[in-house]
Amino acid sequence: TYIETPQAVSPVFLEVKSKDEEGIGHKFRLVATSQAIINLMTDGTVDHQIQDPDLVQEIQRLRKRYGHRLEPRMFIYYDRLSLKEKKSIQGYPYQKIRVTIDQNLVFRDQAVSLFHGKKGEPLLEDDFVIMEIKAPGQEPQWLKDILEKYGLVKQKFSKYSCAYHKSQGLD
């Protein structure tokens, strides 16, 4: 959720990310109340708020694969700055470029409910952020120039995987 202090009726997001046999990533996302999402994950109950049959099918597949009862295991919180390209920049074609910067990342594997506040263990070192650039197709030269100028390199990173490793002392 993007709500500062979520309540039981606050909208929350469920995202399921997976890769197919060819390694192509797929993402399913829905918005509903936390209770509707918990019910779907734990006992398969589909609330009227959940209208995406593909996502429901994916959840049912995961429930079958992992023993029918999925439950929250990790809480991850961060502050996000989201930027997107203006519709038109003189001299440049519009390319739908988006940049997100996540900071103040914390996690916990106990009391994982949204309703237990935002506290947790730091996920990254102090003063580190995660910047994600989404540029469909080829990155424009101006973006490549900025990344090169500041020594920024592409790197894969999973917030959940990092939090899991830290919680298990595998770091």
Description of each model-found segment:
Residues T1-D171:
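Phosphate-end processing signature that detects enzymes handling 5′-triphosphorylated RNA
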